[in-house]
């Protein structure tokens, strides 16, 4: 099946409820807590996005990489067998947006390698042909633009971003 990822827009009340819940691991409460919230769903492409921005898998991110944090969240709330939760507080979103918007897309394109993506098994069990490299990169850039747009909306609304990756 694989793991899917999305970015949920969460208000202060809901995030505080989630963080204060100590009865069970956060992942046990995540679906109930996030039910009905607006979100950007990027399905199984979340690791493609991470790879396209950083050159590494989200399963093995470079320490203190600001582009990795733009995808995974500024703060790791839970990282385990059931999934991953990351949080970017509203006051951190402007810097995250600036970081993503300031990227040189041409430089990212030069660094992008479908051969490396296949070697790292970013999408396990699938080998992508080199003919798809441009199309795959364009898809990653589209997801990045959608993420920037979602982050802008969250910033305007005074909400926070919760990165959710579940299996």
UniProtKB/Swiss-Prot annotation:
Q: Which domain of life is it from?
A: Bacteria
| UniProt-listed Gene3D superfamilies | YfbM-like super family
Q: Which Pfam families match?
A: DUF1877 (PF08974)
InterPro entries given for it? DUF1877, YfbM-like_sf
> How does this protein assemble?
Monomer.
This chain belongs to which protein, by name? Protein YfbM
- Lineage, highest ranks first: Bacteria, Pseudomonadati, Pseudomonadota, Gammaproteobacteria, Enterobacterales
* Chain's gene name: yfbM
